[in-house]
Amino acid sequence: MKYVQAKGLDLSAFALGTVQLGLTYGLGEHSEKPTEEAAFAILDRAVDLGVNTLDTANNYGDSEAVIGRWLTKRKAEGKKLPYIVTKVGPLKHGSYDILRYDVLYQLEGCMKRLCIDKLDIFMLHNYEDYAQDRDAMQKIFADIKSQGLYDYSAISAYSRHDYGVIAESGFDATQIPINVFDWGQIENGGMQKLADSGMMIFTRSVFLQGLVFHTPEDLDPRMDFCFPYLNRFIELYKEFELSPAALALSFVLSLPGVTQAVMGCDTADQVESNCKLFDQTVKLTDEQMNKLHDAFHGIDPRVINPGMWFNRMK
């Protein structure tokens, strides 16, 4: 497993996303929520293979509670424990006191379900909650940290949000979507602002909901706007002598400042496959990055917006 040092932490490049452990998520053979035994097997396999960060949230079904019971079991067995990232929101606004109470109330609920007394990374799930009242959110997070309830603060965002605002927030980390097709925040300087801020940058949606694994032949014809970009991606991963997954992940991990990629897994075997994938990643050269930029600069916005897709598979 590859590791990255950030903010005094030695973090695995692979962070395990756990939304699948708390609710039925996605489509396919393993889309159903796993049994608790299967969930524990996923978590055990990840940590035993070197993954040292779990990503969850208070709206991921009972993911936090499942993790809490697993943590209790691991502690009793004297086994190593991972860092925990969880998220709260949306929040109740109206006054400072109302907002502060809701942040604290949600955080305490998270810690109770996780069976912990202190959280490693406390993340605001909705950028809009921060943007609505930046000064209040900064003060509230600082106040709660002074009480010893968490170590690091974070904000989750989408690519449509202002990364410059996040970079100036004073928070320790952010979580953002990024993939090989989406160059918007790279070209406008948003990614560089995050890197220059020294924040930990956690990434998600690396495979763009699996689009990188498809070919034009297995996509719905109504997604023909993707075809030229997929064909070029296929040409490039063959030229670079990488698998589609390895190129997609290598691209993200080659970006300045990126700390981790968050990936969910449906089975323990998939955890092992993803760990091997991280070992297959490479630092892309400037020439390779330039070829990717030339291929996907000015991409049709429908390609990087799954909300505009039709059913992908024939």
Q: Which functions belong to the PLM regions below?
A:
Residues 31-45, 98-114, 157-165:
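Short, acidic/polar
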Residues 127-303, 311-314:
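Beta/alpha (TIM)-barrel catalytic core signal, keyed to glycine-rich beta->alpha loops juxtaposed to Asp/Glu
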Residues 16, 39, 54, 67, ...:
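Conserved, mostly hydrophobic/aromatic
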Residues 80-94, 122-125:
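A short, structured active-site edge motif that brings together acidic residues
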Residues 68-81, 111-115, 166-169, 192-196:
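Acidic (Asp/Glu)-rich catalytic clusters
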Residues 1-81:
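N-terminal binding-site loop/beta-alpha segment at the start of enzyme catalytic domains
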Residues 57-65, 92-94, 129-132, 181-186:
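Acidic-and-aromatic substrate-binding clefts and catalytic sites of carbohydrate-active enzymes
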